[in-house]
Amino acid sequence: MLVLIRPKATQNFIQLINQLIPYSPNLIIDEATQVVPLPTSIKENSPALFIILAVELDDIGSNGDLLPVLYAMKRHWSAILKHSVAMLMVKSPNEWHTKTFSSWLIFNLNQWGCRFIGHPLVEMIPNLENLGRWEKTTNIAKIQLLHDFSQKAVERLMSFDHCLSPKPKLAVLHASSRKTSNTFMLWHLVKEHLKQIDIEEFHVANGTIIDCIGCPYQTCVYYGRQKSCFYGGDMIRELIPAIEQADALLWLCPNYNDAVSANLMAVINRLTAYYRTHSFNGKQLFSIVVSGNSGGDAVARQLIDALCINKGFQLPPKFCLSAIAYDPGSILEADDIKKRAASYAAQITDSLFISQSIEPSCRKGEPHL
């Protein structure tokens, strides 16, 4: 069932969205009163609901009718959201807000159980300036690029393949001290319950990964086609091969000033060369975030921005486990932490593992040049 949600939209935006979506929605929701319980049958490991959220923002990055719709979705669709997959189309009257609004919306819906495709956002700012680089490198007009990107995103949504494997591989990346890091300790509580997952851990030590300096586009593409990068090093020798083989990545992220640590951001930035010529659309993204005080959602949203919206990793339901712990080792005393770790491990297993052999077709995808 395809549902189009378009709260408080102008007629021009409605007409544009109708042109961009190559399917006829089964249900269109413009306001909260139209969100009612859905009599949709649910099949195991198959989406019951395909959701397109088309949101037209005002000049402060808001939409007055969206929140009542979201509350109604949580009230009436709490069960079916766990069997849904979604994408966004967001238009802003200025150059701001499309990304920050989208990561906020994705984070909250994901916490309710909604899954998101890789590259889930089609964004529109004035004169489609966000598509300027693609116009320059492809010689295709921006309006045509908008139609092309929209159609590909909707096709990914409607043909979504929840890839399960009898031998799933999980690559875990961290830059933490094994002895004192609360984040690493929480990961080990989770790891105890991942018996059916093939796990490979990578410690990104200080200075081992040089950050991206922004090579010219053609240079980046040249190295990407060779599964390489101008700087080489551990990124090419170890991380890229492991990421290529993995079904999912799990990032262990202590909260540093409400941001991902510099070492891990260097890895994310350096993924760009590989991403130029290879697709991450069939791989899933998980994270564990531990904050000293607050702000775990800020780190989670940074990962959503960088790896789901920009790099194209799928976002499984409730992708992030977050906790608060300040003193070294205090995570082990947090309320219900072992229960939460076990529940998160079950979530990872459900997203990756199947007891019978299947062909993992979801690895296919197009590079996002």
Please state what every model-predicted region is.
Residues 1-75, 148-274, 330-369:
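N-terminal beta1-alpha1-beta2 submodule of the flavodoxin-like/Rossmannoid cofactor-binding fold
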Residues 44-45, 60, 65-92, 96-99, ...:
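General detector of N-terminal leader/presequence modules that precede the first folded domain
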Residues 84-130, 140-149, 280-320:
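Short, glycine-/small-residue-rich phosphate/pyrophosphate-handling segment
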Residues 81-82, 163-167, 280-281:
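Short, flexible coil/linker segments at domain boundaries that flank nucleotide/cofactor-interacting
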Residues 272-366:
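Long, contiguous alpha-helical scaffold regions
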Residues 125-134, 248, 321-328:
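A short small-residue
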Residues 21-31, 79-80, 107-118, 192-199, ...:
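Structural alpha-beta junctions
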Residues 28-36, 116-126, 201-205, 315-324:
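A generic structural motif
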